[in-house]
Structure formats: structure tokens, C-alpha cells
């Protein structure tokens, strides 16, 4: 059994992230895509941290597995980037924010 999240914001402080990593880190995959804005909030200056492990999908669909730290930033899209709301709407080539009927 595993936990998969798509475009998750930071949800706890450093202590939370450490405890989470000890208990579920090897079973958690936190997918991020391109320049998705949501994983960048709340800011780390406020004490929030990501849980591991990031699985980064670039805008061409290439996948990179993170280094196991919650705050790893994969790919060139993560370096002083402009954030994108539209990158939050698509993961693994699928529209994830609504129903298509």
C-alpha cells in the first residue's frame, strides 16, 4: 500500500515532515508537475516542509524521482521559476481538476 499525492502543498512543519518520513516516507510519492504553483505554498520561511518523496514530471512528460528529501526541487522548472496554475490542472497527461462527462 502506498500514498500518492498530486500537486500537494506543504502540510506541516519540519517535525511533522520528519515523523511522516520515518513512518510513511518509503511508501509516499508526492507528484509535482512543471511549474505548478500549489507545491510552493505555504512558504518554507513560515516553517512548512514537504514530505518525501517527490516525483517530478516536467512539461514534456519526463519523470524524475527526487533525492528522498521533502524539499528536493527537480528539473530546471524549479529554479527561480514563474509559477503556473495550469500546470496544477494536468498530471501524467490527464486533466485532474474536474469531471469530464
Which role fits each region the language model picked out?
Residues 1-101:
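Serine hydrolase/lipase
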